[in-house]
Amino acid sequence: MTTKYNEIYQSSINNPEKFWQEISEDIFWFKKPTKVLNKFNPPFYKWFEDGVTNTCYNALDYNIEQGRGEKTALIYDSPITGNKAKFTYKELRHKVSKFAGALDNQGIKKGDRVIIYMPMVPEAVIAMLACGRIGAIHSVVFGGFASNELASRIDDSKAKILITASCGFEPGKTVEYRPLVDGALKLAKHKIEKIIFFQRKGYEIKLNSPKEISWNEVLSNSKDMDCVEMKSNEFAYILYTSGTTGVPKGIVRDIGGHIVALKWTMKNIYNIDADDVWWSASDIGWIVGHSYIVYAPLFKGCTTVLFEGKPVGTPDAGVFWRIISDYKIKSLFTAPTAFRAIKKEDPEGKFFSKYDLSSFESLFLAGERADPDTIKWAENLLNVPVIDHWWQTETSWAISANCTGIEMQKTKYGSACKAVPGYDVKVMKPDQSLTKPNEMGDIVVKLPLPPGTFSTLWNADERYKKTYMSNYESYYQTYDAGHIDEDGYIWVMSRTDDIINVAGHRLSTGAIEEVLSEHQSVAECAVFGIADKLKGQLPIGLIALKAGVQKDNETISKECIQMVRDKVGPVAAFKTAIVVKRLPKTRSGKILRGTVRKIADNEEYKMPATIDDPTILDEIKQDLIKNNISKV
């Protein structure tokens, strides 16, 4: 029987040009494209090559033309500061247009790069959209990132202006941006021409040089700016991904394909219409923030929420429920780690019962693999579909998902459901042959990738080809490992460098983590491989417990080891499960398994630029030493 999903998916694969041409009719073009896809120079494919449009026009002006000017575009809620604000589409356009005029006054023209190093405040969104309005290319850097990381982005992008703030806030602490910015400017070889500081109330700083200007001052004599016409294949933004060494990779997003694909996803993947309120609990410094706090919801014309807070500690594990209740949110998109944190602090869901969540219809998880136990916990608590889906900074939207706006598929716990229309996903062996159903391998996507995905790296075409497009001919290598089952469900088990080899058996750390997370006392866990003379590698488990657990650590460890032996088998040689206070993560919630492995193997490692709290690594090192895993 042909289902609606199968019909749409097959049409996207069998005739992608017709499929995307029809979808492209749904956005605003100054000049509609006559060519859908240029494939004459693979892997540098170009979508809607001769089309002319504008990112900001589609996000704001087009919605106002459609009669949505008085509708709320952006809700800001900061439990850290207590500040709240709402902006209609007209109000947001006015602020964006004025700031675009301010950038124009500072000499910013089409194609110039602008770095945005900001906390989660409305001014950050305004700056992003203002860049799009005048054709500048923004590069958002996570607010509070280390000076050397900011400097590398300044040097690679050759940005003219840096837009920043006096500070950011984390639970219980203020992060001053001035020392970080000053440090970056000293390290950077490229010289920034101007720095615009947004002064946070009560945390104003003194401006030290003629290069520095306050947000309010730069707006004082600015004029409104209209949107400039942009070719479809010009760039909307650069978003850098951190490598462990060398120059970070600058992912670039072309304008036309970005608008077409992201607007389509809001209804087809997330079932969001223009009348709905949508919340993506991420940060604008990450791809989820770019795509699903700012661009996709505004392209769709719905209401989007900008949240300056954390899932726990601002003030408690009920803040997510308060936001959903206050703003009548239909769907939430966040990382699995957010729900693990809530589950750890409030395993019984006591905070949940205090709020009215009658508007809430679905929860979407992505960022790293969602273990089945967390999904089931959330399902039981929320009584709505909880959907794990999979995508990457490089793609900007989901590769596999349960497309709720097309047709709900049956849930298979541990799978990110089926390929999204547009993505021809395969699993391959290193010899370039296809795997059998349920056989582990490298997950790849047939070229050309759909619109909205990255078309190259900033000033690094050869690096783009070599890194992503050369290992599997005519395929994009995702660097994720997993399998596809007999029903077409995609199981993303781990990054390819998280596959461990135990006595010749290739095992996924994700498969072992899935078992550990089923233990009733375990809130979250991480598995990594250490070097072993006899077996090559051995898996080690780190487990963090739920709040209020009474059972002793030794008993829990023994039970976890037995569970892995029972469910994965003796082949895993899993003999060590260490209870730790907390796990080392990036600010976006990814667990730093590779860094922990290096600590365990006494290898040199670089402090990850994205680490949430560097002190955790010392805690982990001491735990490993106590358990005879690492030597001083």
What is the meaning of each model-derived region?
Residues 56, 74-129, 146, 150-151, ...:
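Conserved AMP-binding/adenylate-forming core of the ANL superfamily
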Residues 70-72, 195-198, 208-240, 247, ...:
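Conserved pre-ATP/AMP-binding loop-to-beta segment of ANL
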Residues 129, 133-217, 336:
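Structural core segment of the AMP-binding/adenylate-forming
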Residues 141-166, 181, 325, 332, ...:
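AMP-binding/adenylate-forming catalytic core of the ANL superfamily
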Residues 193-199, 534-537, 566-591, 603-629:
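AMP-binding/adenylate-forming catalytic domain of the ANL superfamily
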Residues 259-277, 287-330, 344-350:
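Conserved AMP-binding/adenylation subdomain of ANL enzymes
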Residues 302, 330-334, 343-410, 424, ...:
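Gly/Ser/Thr-rich phosphate-binding loop
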